[in-house]
Amino acid sequence: MMQPSIKPADEHSAADIIARIGSLTRMLRDSLRELGLDRAIAEAAEAIPDARDRLDYVVQMTAQAAERALNSVEASQPHQEEMEKGAKSLSQRWDAWFDDPIELAQARELVTDTRRFLAEVPDHTRFTNAQLLDIMMAQDFQDLTGQVIKRMMDVIQEIERQLLMVLLENIPEQDARPKRENESLLNGPQVDTSKAGVVASQDQVDDLLDSLGF
């Protein structure tokens, strides 16, 4: 049989190609609509950008919370170090005084320094408490991101359920097909997970897709 010769593309051949592509596209769309796949694909296409935006939101909230916590820790460290340094210095000076009591003038200076240190402690602790509160408040992102992630999981599970239903409703007849252990799953997913043949786990979904050749 003679093979048709390939001619250079001209305006007529280009128009013919475009027309054929249009016909194929229309046939594909009609077939998808007849099978009920157009709705599932449209929902999946809409869910993908939405899921991406939600994941970006989770990432941003997590990064902001981590940055707030780190900033609060860094701001608190100098105050903690100053209190630690002052307490150690005064403790050493008081130990030395008890070992060898010094003159009254030097004792007054030690007492004055101690009183000054004690007066500054509330300011340091107040600042540190404020930073700790900010760290705690930064963790409120978990509630928001948890809701977002749960919503995403609901959308994904719904898309999976609809696509699975489309497959189950359009399975071609195969009388010679070997009997499988999960044959009853071809009747479609059931809601009551206590019954036999219920698609109740991801493993069962995978087995069902394998049995369909996907």
From Swiss-Prot:
UniProt cross-references to Pfam families, sorted A to Z: CheZ
The catalytic activity of this protein is classed by the Enzyme Commission as 3.1.3.-
Q: Which spans does this entry mark as compositional bias, Polar residues? A: 184-193
Q: Where in the cell is it found?
A: Cytoplasm
Q: Which cysteines are joined by disulfide bonds?
A: none
Stretches the record annotates as Disordered:
176-199
Q: Which GO terms describe its molecular function?
A: phosphoprotein phosphatase activity
List keywords of the entry alphabetically.
Chemotaxis, Cytoplasm, Flagellar rotation, Hydrolase, Protein phosphatase
Q: Which GO terms describe its biological process?
A: archaeal or bacterial-type flagellum-dependent cell motility; chemotaxis; regulation of chemotaxis
Offer a single GO CC term for the protein: bacterial-type flagellum
- Asked if Hydrolase is a keyword of the record, the answer is yes
Q: Which InterPro entries match?
A: Chemotax_Pase_CheZ, CheZ_family_phosphatases
Site feature Enhances dephosphorylation of CheY-P, where: Q147
UniProt entry tagged with the keyword Cytoplasm: yes
Q: Which family does it belong to?
A: Belongs to the CheZ family.
Q: What does this protein do?
A: Plays an important role in bacterial chemotaxis signal transduction pathway by accelerating the dephosphorylation of phosphorylated CheY (CheY-P).
Quaternary structure and partners: Homodimer.
The identity of this protein, by name, is Protein phosphatase CheZ
- Gene encoding the protein: cheZ
